[in-house]
């Protein structure tokens, strides 16, 4: 579901180039889901290799990471660990949404409505066995580090910004702000030209950055209070939120009363919400321990052998992407040498 803080946080447009030389901790599952949902054929079906295995995520990781490295960006991918018990309701909700979308997809295909078919196909997106291993394999070949979080990937990505190991975390979800990320970048892995569903129109999706401290100052809230605002709206750990409370009402209530326990109108509902545990998930997430981030060299031959030889990618397209990366890195190296 993700947290609906869009109307409240302070967002500023930015450019990918502004992250050159900076480490960005990417919510891996969030990025991979985006690739799986958007990189599809005209009928809405995902790309596959000769054995029928999905390759949409690998295509996204190839082109996006080649672009990142070409610009001098240092991506680090953070994979989810075991989900908190409180997330089970949200996981079940997502499962039901996908089942319903699958039925609608089949009906749209039968009716010959390919726009609807593609829309519903995207809603069926799920992470299947092997996709995480596939993703880690291509990251290794690029020399890009990845981290297995003990629980929520966004929490560990936020932790990396707190320790100074990363400049920002990257995710479409606003949960990173509640987890304490110093900076959150949205549209980081899906920026560019995108088609508007059911319309023959395209938009340019631009990255945007959210400074958590600026957001807290603008809203006149502590981080603890912002977590309470999130709980009122609804998080992955209480997806229904509170009845008839949206972002602006939640902010007003916390301003007036300070904390959940002191808001009169929600007391009947509050007893059925594990709000103390949800607070702890955001404010005291499980520690990832000592993390060492090491970047390696790109294995151009290894990427080609894996994607072309094992996953049925076009040799010409892979070569073109890697050649662009090689030329960009050579140019950056030459420019750097001029300073010495």
Curated annotation (Swiss-Prot):
Mg(2+) 1 binds at residues 27, 80, 152, 154. Residues 1-98 are annotated as: N-domain. InterPro entries: 5-3_exonuclease_C_sf, Flap_endonuc, Flap_endonuc_arc, HhH2, PIN-like_dom_sf, XPG-I_dom, XPG/Rad2, XPG_CS. One of its GO terms (biological process) is DNA repair. It comes from the Archaea. Keywords: DNA damage, DNA repair, DNA replication, Endonuclease, Exonuclease, Hydrolase, Magnesium, Metal-binding, Nuclease. SMART domains: HhH2, XPGI, XPGN. Mg(2+) 2 binds at residues 173, 175, 236. Binds 2 magnesium ions per subunit. They probably participate in the reaction catalyzed by the enzyme. May bind an additional third magnesium ion after substrate binding. Its EC number is 3.1.-.-. GO terms for molecular function: 5'-3' exonuclease activity; 5'-flap endonuclease activity; DNA binding; magnesium ion binding. Residues 116-258 are annotated as: I-domain. The keyword Nucleotide-binding does not apply. Its cofactor is Mg(2+). Structure-specific nuclease with 5'-flap endonuclease and 5'-3' exonuclease activities involved in DNA replication and repair. During DNA replication, cleaves the 5'-overhanging flap structure that is generated by displacement synthesis when DNA polymerase encounters the 5'-end of a downstream Okazaki fragment. Binds the unpaired 3'-DNA end and kinks the DNA to facilitate 5' cleavage specificity. Cleaves one nucleotide into the double-stranded DNA from the junction in flap DNA, leaving a nick for ligation. Also involved in the base excision repair (BER) pathway. Interacts with PCNA. PCNA stimulates the nuclease activity without altering cleavage specificity. Belongs to the XPG/RAD2 endonuclease family. FEN1 subfamily. This is Flap endonuclease 1. It comes from Cenarchaeum symbiosum (strain A).
């Amino acid at each position: 579901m993700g947290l609906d803080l869009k109307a409240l946080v302070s967002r500023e447009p930015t450019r990918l180039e502004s992250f050159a030389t900076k480490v960005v901790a990417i919510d891996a599952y969030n990025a991979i889901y985006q690739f799986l949902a958007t990189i599809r054929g005209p009928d809405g079906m995902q790309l596959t290799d000769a054995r029928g295995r999905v390759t949409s995520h690998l295509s996204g990781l190839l082109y996006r990471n080649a672009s990142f490295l070409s610009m001098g960006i240092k991506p680090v991918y953070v994979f989810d660990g075991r989900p908190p018990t409180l997330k089970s309701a949200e996981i079940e909700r997502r499962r039901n949404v996908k089942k319903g979308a699958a039925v609608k997809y089949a009906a749209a295909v039968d009716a010959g409505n390919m726009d609807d078919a593609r829309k519903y196909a995207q809603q069926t997106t799920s992470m299947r066995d092997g996709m995480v291993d596939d993703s880690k394999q291509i990251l290794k070949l690029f020399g890009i580090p990845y981290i297995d979080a003990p629980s929520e990937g966004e929490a560990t990505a936020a932790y990396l910004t707190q320790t100074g190991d990363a400049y920002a975390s990257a995710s479409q979800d606003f949960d990173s702000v509640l987890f304490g990320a110093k900076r959150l970048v949205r549209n980081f892995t899906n920026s560019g030209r995108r088609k508007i569903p059911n319309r023959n129109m395209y938009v340019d999706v631009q990255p945007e950055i959210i400074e958590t401290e600026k957001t807290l100052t603008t809203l006149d809230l502590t981080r603890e209070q912002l977590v309470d605002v999130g709980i009122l709206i609804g998080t992955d750990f209480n997806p229904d939120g509170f009845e008839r409370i949206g972002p602006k009402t939640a902010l007003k209530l916390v301003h007036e009363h300070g904390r959940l326990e002191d808001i009169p109108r929600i007391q009947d509902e509050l007893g059925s919400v594990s709000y103390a545990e949800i607070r702890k998930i955001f404010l005291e997430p499980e520690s990832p321990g000592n993390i060492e981030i090491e970047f390696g060299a790109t294995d151009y031959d290894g990427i080609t052998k894996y994607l072309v030889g094992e996953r049925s990618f076009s040799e010409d397209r892979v070569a073109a992407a890697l050649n662009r990366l090689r030329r960009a890195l050579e140019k950056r190296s030459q420019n750097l040498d001029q300073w010495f």
